[in-house]
């Protein structure tokens, strides 16, 4: 079994060694320009077109949970990968736990009003504030995939009212499920904290705009953990300035790194991190990939395959 590996920043030698330990019958090599030798599987992130074009692969693994970048390249270069070759994404590989940590810590930060107390501290003001109640702090999750399910599960322990919005109905214990555009308003109008975990598709680009934000309760919060292109940043800033939104926590942006001139840097009610909410953890990723390749070789059912038409 031949496996080729390409990632512009990962330590290729470490990955090659670890993969060969996990798959003793495989030969793994780092792909380099000019390598046209046969391969059965490809592990990639931002691959050049020529790496995959014309290859008779059994499967391709994207080294991340998001596959919008590779799908965009496939749409621009259909010759890059035959439609019959399955594409897999990393289903969890430790990302679920990271998303849980991030989401829970931020919801609690807002619930306990730590943002307000930091503002008071900056003014040297000693002023206890009224507490929020859990009943008035409903959390709504847009996107009910693997990571959305993990975040909902972690928030249940804290007693917040929970709801999710997705393409298909979910039956998660203790979570109200809303489906499609026709139920979006009902989902939004009782959501105090909006967590975005949507996939990046043509239907979701720019979805967090003034029309959507106006449907949230006054004083709501937005936590974006998905993709920067989901948010119309000017609309978000306008909602913060008007008081419609009380705060926003952003891990992703329409342009990364975020330009120095962006007003998001200086807005007092915007907090941010540099796209680190959930990163690929090599050991967990290799465990998933090696297990899935073994199942594919045996003809067993697998999970994590990307639906190219849907975009995730």
From Swiss-Prot:
Pfam families hit by this protein: 2-Hacid_dh_C
Localization, UniProt: Cytoplasm
The entry's keywords: Cytoplasm, NAD, NADP, Oxidoreductase
Active site: 227, 275 (proton donor)
Reactions catalysed: glycolate + NADP(+) = glyoxylate + NADPH + H(+); (R)-glycerate + NAD(+) = 3-hydroxypyruvate + NADH + H(+); (R)-glycerate + NADP(+) = 3-hydroxypyruvate + NADPH + H(+)
NCBIfam families given in the database record: PRK15469.1
Organism expressing this protein natively: Salmonella newport (strain SL254)
Family, per entry: Belongs to the D-isomer specific 2-hydroxyacid dehydrogenase family. GhrA subfamily.
GO CC list: cytoplasm
InterPro entries named in the record: D-isomer_DH_NAD-bd (IPR006140), GhrA_Enterobacterales (IPR023514), NAD(P)-bd_dom_sf (IPR036291)
MF terms (GO), sorted A to Z: glyoxylate reductase (NADPH) activity; hydroxypyruvate reductase (NADH) activity; hydroxypyruvate reductase (NADPH) activity; NAD binding
SUPFAM superfamilies the UniProt entry points to: NAD(P)-binding Rossmann-fold domains (SSF51735)
Lineage of origin: Bacteria, Pseudomonadati, Pseudomonadota, Gammaproteobacteria, Enterobacterales
The protein's name: Glyoxylate/hydroxypyruvate reductase A
Domain of life where this protein originates: Bacteria
EC number: 1.1.1.79, 1.1.1.81
CDD domains hit by this protein: GDH_like_2
Reported function: Catalyzes the NADPH-dependent reduction of glyoxylate and hydroxypyruvate into glycolate and glycerate, respectively.
């Amino acid at each position: 079994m031949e496996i080729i590996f390409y990632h512009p920043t990962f330590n290729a030698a470490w990955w090659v060694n670890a993969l060969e330990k996990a798959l003793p019958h495989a030969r793994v090599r780092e792909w380099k320009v000019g390598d046209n030798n046969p391969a059965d599987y490809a592990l990639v992130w931002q691959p050049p077109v020529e790496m995959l074009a014309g290859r008779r692969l059994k499967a391709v693994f994207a080294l991340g949970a998001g596959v919008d970048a590779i799908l965009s390249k496939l749409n621009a270069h259909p010759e890059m990968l035959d439609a019959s070759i399955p594409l897999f994404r990393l289903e969890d590989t430790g990302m679920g736990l990271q998303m849980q940590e991030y989401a829970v810590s931020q919801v609690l930060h807002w619930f306990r009003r730590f943002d307000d107390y930091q503002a008071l501290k900056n003014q040297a003001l000693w002023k206890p504030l009224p507490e929020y109640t859990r009943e008035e702090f409903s959390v709504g999750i847009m996107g009910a995939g693997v990571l959305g399910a993990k975040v909902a599960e972690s928030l249940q322990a804290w007693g917040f009212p929970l709801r999710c919005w997705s393409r298909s109905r979910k039956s998660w214990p203790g979570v109200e499920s809303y489906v499609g555009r026709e139920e979006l308003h009902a989902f939004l109008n009782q959501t105090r904290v909006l967590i975005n975990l949507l996939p990046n598709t043509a239907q979701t680009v720019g979805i967090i705009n003034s029309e959507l934000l106006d449907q949230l309760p006054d004083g709501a919060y937005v936590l974006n953990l998905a993709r920067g292109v989901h948010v119309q940043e000017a609309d978000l800033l306008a909602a913060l300035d008007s008081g419609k939104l009380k705060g926003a926590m952003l891990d992703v942006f329409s342009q990364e790194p975020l330009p120095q001139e962006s007003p998001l840097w200086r807005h007092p009610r915007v907090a941010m991190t540099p796209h680190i909410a959930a990163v690929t953890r090599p050991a967990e990723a290799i465990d998933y990939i090696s297990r899935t390749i073994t199942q594919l070789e045996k003809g067993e059912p697998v999970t994590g395959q990307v639906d190219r038409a849907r975009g995730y």
